[in-house]
Structure formats: structure tokens, C-alpha cells
Design a protein with these regions (language model features):
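Glycine-rich, flexible beta-strand/loop modules in the N-terminal catalytic cores of phosphate-handling
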Residues: 95-178, 258-268, 272-277
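A generic local secondary-structure boundary/capping motif
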Residues: 85-88, 95-98, 119-124, 168-172, ...
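Glycine/serine-rich anion-binding loops at beta->alpha junctions
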Residues: 90-101, 186-200
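A short glycine/serine-rich beta->alpha loop
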Residues: 146-152, 184-192
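Mobile "lid/hinge" segments at catalytic clefts and subdomain interfaces of large enzymes
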Residues: 1-15, 205-281
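Extended amphipathic alpha-helical scaffolds
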Residues: 2-125, 281
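Acidic, glycine-rich active-site loops and adjacent beta-strand->loop/helix elements
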Residues: 111-115, 137-139, 184-190, 220-227, ...
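Alpha-helical support elements that line or immediately flank enzyme active sites
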Residues: 107-109, 197-209
Length: 281
């Protein structure tokens, strides 16, 4: 009960990522005091789970009943944006920086000749790839420590999603015969780094003089739904805790002419078509 007033007071005045971190720290201190004389690990585990249950309940209640969000934004309001082209282009062909709130991504562009295309080999086929987008998510991006090494499944998936979003606007080989490689690195994360990498990569391509057909941007749409599913709220530009405690992460990328890539992650049994249509309008 001690933690509820603190959460209710701070959820509307701070970044939700900071609030959840403070809540976890306070919760651990309270648990240490309560269970310092016992070795009942099962009871401690149940108590730890309660924090996440309450945070989940608090985020849903705020969106469904108060029509607002943890950092005070409206449900259809995006975070503050910042974009910059260049900066390190003296050692690379192009670069772009894109900030969306606490999510920061740096993309760099390198151009090569036709002989630099990536060779794709399968059991029964071989092909060449002229445009590549790679995504890196180092541990420090999320405020953690860890091994920095080969690419993991998450990085591969996010990189390929951004690559699919950008491929339709890449110029034809006959007009731009160069091999194009973009590397996006998340330097700070609070949700939607994959979509921020699409924006940063677009800036890097334009900074490097690649004649893309039109700029591409991406955003993540979240969902808060009640237990029965008859009441819901869509959230534009979800941040980390809203992704973690929310019911949907609907990644949508496209241009002024239409959608170029979609990825849907859900935590509920299913999402109604009407909800997806509303998210896309």
C-alpha cells in the first residue's frame, strides 16, 4: 500500500520509464525490510509479481478512465521530435540523427560499387542484394550492461523491418547503380527504436544524396483494452512501459503515398479488425 500513493502522484508528472524504475527500487527496499527474517522464496516471488500487476493496472486505468498517459500526453499525442542531417558525414557518405522523446537513433550511410552487393545463398538459389539496413541495439541503450558481440534475433528482426519499409523508395539500379548500406544504432531507448531507425535512416539516405522516391517515417500504435474487450483506447507513439504493459504494439511505416511495412505484436487473444482500421486512420 505504501507504493500506490507514490505511483499515482508521479505517473502524471514524470517519464513513465523513470517512474517504473523508481517504483521497482522502492518495492525492492520494502521487500527486503519485510522478508529480511524469512527465507520463503515463494512468498517473496508473489510479492514481486504484485508490483508488475499494479503497474499494469495503473497504466490501463489511466488510459481507459482518464484518457491520459503516464507522461501527461494525450492519447493521440506524440513525443517531442528532433532530427538532424549530417554531422559525421566527413568520414561517411551520409548520416542522420532522430530523437523521439527518450528514444535516440543514429543512422550512417555507406555507398559502394556494384561489386559490393551482398551475395544471398540458399539451398537452390543465389541472388544479390543492393540495399541493406542493419540495426544495432547495444546494452547501454537501455541503461544496462552486457556483452557486445554478434547480432541477436531482435536486432535482426528490427533491421529487416526497417529495410522492408525503406526498400520501396530506393532508386532503381539503372538510375543509381551503387550498393547502399545503412546502419542504425540505438543510442538511447524508451520504446519504438525500430520505427525511429526508419526515420533516422531516411535522413541519412537524403544526406548522402541517394535520390529516394519519397521520405519514409514510422510510428508504433499501442492498445489499452479492458478485461472484456468492449472498451479500448489507442495510443500514438508508445514508450517503453506502455509497450511492456500494453496489449498491442502495432508498428506502421510508410510515406505520404501509402504504407510500406507493418508488424503487429499482441498480448491479448486477438485484435478486432475495426481496431486495426482505426489505428491506420
Amino acid at each position: 500500500e505504501k507504493i500506490k500513493p507514490m505511483l499515482e502522484e508521479k505517473l502524471l508528472t514524470s517519464e513513465s520509464k523513470k517512474v517504473t524504475s523508481e517504483a521497482e527500487t522502492l518495492w525492492k527496499e520494502l521487500l527486503e525490510q519485510k522478508y529480511k527474517d524469512t527465507d520463503d522464496e515463494k512468498e517473496q516471488s508473489v510479492a514481486e509479481d504484485y508490483l508488475h500487476h499494479y503497474l499494469d493496472e495503473a497504466f490501463h486505468k489511466m488510459a481507459l478512465e482518464k484518457n491520459t498517459r503516464a507522461d501527461g500526453r494525450k492519447i493521440d499525442e506524440i513525443r517531442k521530435l528532433f532530427a538532424k542531417a549530417g554531422g559525421i558525414s566527413d568520414v561517411l557518405h551520409g548520416s542522420g540523427i532522430f530523437y523521439r522523446g527518450e528514444t535516440h537513433v543514429l543512422s550512417v550511410l555507406a555507398l559502394g560499387g556494384p561489386e559490393d552487393m551482398q551475395t544471398i545463398e540458399g539451398m537452390e538459389f543465389q541472388s544479390k542484394k543492393r540495399f541493406m539496413h542493419h540495426y544495432n541495439f547495444p546494452p547501454y541503450s537501455g541503461g544496462e550492461t552486457g556483452r557486445v558481440g554478434g547480432i541477436n534475433r531482435r536486432e535482426m528482426g528490427h533491421g529487416f523491418l526497417a529495410e522492408k519499409a525503406l526498400t520501396p523508395v530506393i532508386p532503381e539500379k539503372v538510375s543509381f547503380p551503387y550498393t547502399i548500406r545503412v546502419v542504425s544504432e540505438s543510442t538511447a531507448s524508451n520504446g519504438s527504436t525500430s520505427q525511429a531507425s526508419i526515420c533516422a535512416a531516411t535522413i541519412a539516405l537524403m544526406d548522402g544524396g541517394v535520390p529516394i522516391k519519397t521520405p519514409v517515417a514510422g510510428i508504433s500504435i499501442g492498445l489499452m483494452e479492458n478485461a472484456t474487450g468492449d472498451k479500448y483506447v489507442l495510443l500514438s507513439d508508445i514508450q517503453g512501459p506502455e509497450d511492456h504493459y500494453g496489449d498491442m504494439d502495432f508498428k506502421v511505416a510508410g510515406t505520404k503515398n501509402g504504407i510500406t511495412a507493418i508488424q503487429l505484436d499482441v498480448k491479448v487473444a486477438g485484435v478486432k479488425i475495426a481496431i486495426l482500421k482505426e489505428a491506420l486512420t
